[in-house]
């Protein structure tokens, strides 16, 4: 899980979702997991 000020889609399998007011990227590739904050 990378924590970044701006989350970006890295590949076509990445999805941007909102959980509890946080913007997150979920993906099949665990290296692409990101969270904003």
Curated annotation (Swiss-Prot):
It comes from Acetivibrio thermocellus (strain ATCC 27405 / DSM 1237 / JCM 9322 / NBRC 103400 / NCIMB 10682 / NRRL B-4536 / VPI 7372). It holds the Pfam family Ribosomal_L36. GO terms for molecular function: structural constituent of ribosome. Keywords: Ribonucleoprotein, Ribosomal protein. GO terms for cellular component: cytoplasm; ribonucleoprotein complex; ribosome. PANTHER family: 50S RIBOSOMAL PROTEIN L36, CHLOROPLASTIC (PTHR42888), LARGE RIBOSOMAL SUBUNIT PROTEIN BL36C (PTHR42888:SF1). NCBIfam families: rpmJ_bact (TIGR01022). One of its GO terms (biological process) is translation. This is Large ribosomal subunit protein bL36. Belongs to the bacterial ribosomal protein bL36 family. Signal peptide: none annotated. InterPro entries: Ribosomal_bL36, Ribosomal_bL36_sp.
């Amino acid at each position: 899980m990378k924590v970044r000020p701006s989350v970006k889609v890295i590949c076509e399998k990445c999805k941007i979702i909102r959980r509890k007011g946080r913007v997150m990227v979920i993906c099949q590739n665990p290296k692409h997991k990101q969270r904003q904050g």
